[in-house]
Design a protein with these regions (language model features):
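Short loop/turn and capping residues at structural boundaries
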Residues: 4-6, 125-126, 168
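N-terminal lobe of the biotin/lipoate ligase/transferase fold
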Residues: 1-116, 138
Length: 266
């Protein structure tokens, strides 16, 4: 039991030991685990390690990030002890277009891990956010380290932040929530890593159906920014490449391969 200022007490899992050794023992493949109580950003640290010559499969994990990063230059709120912040690094040596599906794989890995160790069924907001009960509980930032001479991806850095028991979020962070279940952090990290390892080398067809089934967007009225302006549409389907097919207000269809989607409130 942990005391929470002005809020009484919050139950935590028994013996929630969160360190590299505890994470490592439940990982079912050969993977180096580098753990920090606090770090600026697990993605940033992973890229520093790659720059210093790391060429193995490794996992950077932190109990807190002081400068967590999200997509499109946004920050990712990463307070101590209430979430897990991890970066998984693989070296696929593949063409850039073949690495695009890794973000989709990461979403599926997080959802499968949550389903395995809790009773929660998460949903996916295209392209790479995980939601529970209509609120975001996980963000994913995938970055590629490329070789310009060969036009291949030498390393892929997959950053994942999951809110487990975070109760208060700073102003400006909208629609965020937490898993709010009794789960051991090391167990969750290991489960995500195991799923990731299986999926990143799998063909897209192995997991795209799962991604579709867990989508929260299909049939919803949405908008996205195009040429600096809001464009209104209805989400129709996710195609075999993971792109989002939408119907515009004028009846035309369009295929989105990247960008930020917002569900319109009814």
């Amino acid at each position: 039991i942990e005391a929470v200022t002005n809020r009484g007490y919050r139950l935590l899992p028994d013996n929630d030991i969160f360190d590299g050794e505890t994470i490592k023992k439940d990982i079912d493949f050969d993977c180096r685990v580098v753990f920090y109580d606090s770090i600026d950003s697990t993605n940033t640290q992973a890229k520093r390690m790659i720059s210093d010559g790391a060429d193995d499969v490794f996992l950077v994990v932190a109990a807190e990030q002081t400068a967590g990063r999200g997509r499109q230059g946004k920050s990712f709120y990463s307070p101590a002890d209430t979430g897990v912040y991890m970066t998984f690094v693989v070296h696929p040596n593949t063409a850039l277009q073949n690495a695009v599906g890794i973000t989709t794989a990461a979403c599926v890995a997080v959802c499968r891990a949550i389903e395995k160790i809790t009773d929660i069924t998460p949903q996916i907001k295209w392209v790479n956010d995980v939601y529970v009960n209509g609120k975001k509980i996980c963000g994913i930032l995938t970055e590629a380290v490329t070789d310009f001479e060969t036009q291949t991806v030498s390393s892929v850095v997959i950053g994942i932040g999951i809110n487990i028991s975070t109760e208060h979020f700073p102003d400006g962070i909208e629609n965020a929530s937490s898993l709010n279940v009794n789960v051991k952090r090391a167990q969750l990290v290991s489960a995500v890593a195991n799923e990731l390892n299986r999926l990143v080398c799998s063909p897209f067809s192995d997991y795209i159906d799962y991604y579709r089934e867990h989508s929260m967007l299909i049939g919803e009225d949405i908008y996205f920014i195009k040429n600096g302006e809001k464009t209104y549409a209805k989400a129709l389907a996710i195609d075999s490449d993971g792109a989002l097919e939408v119907e515009l207000e004028n009846g035309e269809t369009e295929t989105l391969r990247s960008g930020e989607i917002t569900v319109r409130k009814k």
